[in-house]
Design a protein with these regions (language model features):
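A short acidic, glycine-rich active-site loop
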Residues: 41-45, 120, 217-220
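Short glycine-centered, acidic/aromatic-flanked micro-motifs in structured strand/loop junctions
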Residues: 8, 71-73, 109, 143-147, ...
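Conserved beta-strand positions in the central sheet of alpha/beta enzyme cores
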Residues: 32, 68-70, 106, 144, ...
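Active-site acidic/histidine proton-transfer and metal-coordination neighborhood
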Residues: 17-18, 22, 53, 57-65, ...
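Histidine-acidic metal/acid-base catalytic patches
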Residues: 1-29, 60-62, 138, 153-271
Length: 271
């Protein structure tokens, strides 16, 4: 079954209790906190053990999940010393996820070395993930590599996951980003569907040559087709709304949360 989740990026000024109220009002099951951005929910790697236990109790008491920890970790970071820092950061986020009862941690490939061929870059990224997948397995957490930035195209992402060859590295399929590089949903699905463990959702329109995020089902990004394909294969995971509002910008979160929930339910009903 495909469940509905929201990222804290949608409502960065809401504390955890406010997020829970919004989730329950609009039928969301999962929360995906975006760490490192100072969101009011306060979910970060520096939480104490007591704070982690309290958050977990609060979510579980409401029948809700922390479904994924969204990090800014980048495994294609060209500078090896900086990449080593990303690896250590990822270990801390895996520990955070485990303590919160969360089974997924999102990472990026990030900007690749443009002077190198793809196979070299894939090998380099594989080397990074290989340093941490056993750590993730020990803690019962799956690392996700998102189709994002230099890694919007499906084949390189699949290549990384298959070369690592570990059950605790999977793919986060962001429907928008694969389509932005002109892949049809069916093409992406055929390339890596068996490795997909989490989904990101945000619709939009091209305005002056740039993507402007908007209401689900009213833009140019096809969410219906990939949901249908995944549903037929028995995918069980989260469709996580990634509409990003800046901290302190105010307004908009409640309406976006409601609109995406209603559109998502209409899409599921037609599958």
């Amino acid at each position: 079954m495909i469940e509905l989740a929201t990222m804290s990026s949608l409502c960065p000024d809401w504390n955890l209790s406010e997020i829970i109220d919004g989730m329950k009002c609009h039928g969301y099951k999962g929360l995906e906190p975006r760490v490192e951005w100072g969101h009011a929910c306060g979910i970060e790697a520096d939480l104490s053990g007591d704070e982690r236990r309290a958050i977990r109790r609060q979510m579980e008491g409401e029948g809700l999940d922390i479904c994924c920890i969204a990090t800014g970790v980048r495994m294609a970071e060209v500078d090896r010393e900086k990449r080593a820092e990303h690896v250590e950061d990822l270990k801390r986020y895996i520990d955070l996820a485990a303590d919160l009862g969360c089974g997924l941690v999102r990472t990026f490939g990030g900007q690749r070395d443009r002077d190198r061929e793809w196979q070299y870059v894939v090998d380099y990224v594989v080397e990074g993930y290989a340093q941490v997948v056993d750590w993730a397995e020990e803690r019962g957490v799956v690392i996700l590599m998102e189709t994002h930035d230099d890694w919007c195209s499906s084949p390189p992402v699949r290549a990384v996951v298959e070369q690592v060859g570990h059950a605790h590295l999977k793919i986060l399929w962001d429907f928008m980003h694969t389509q932005r590089v002109l892949e049809r949903p069916g093409e992406s699905f055929s390339i890596f569907a068996e490795h997909v463990a989490h989904l990101h959702a945000h619709d939009g329109q091209y305005v002056d040559g740039k993507m402007q995020v908007g209401a689900l089902g009213e833009g140019v990004i096809d969410h219906q087709t990939p949901l249908q394909l995944l549903g037929k294969m028995g995918f069980a995971g989260y469709f996580s709304v990634e509409v990003i509002h800046k901290v302190g910008a105010g307004g908009g979160a409640e309406g976006v949360m409601a609109q995406y929930a209603n559109a998502f339910r209409r899409m599921l009903a037609s599958i």
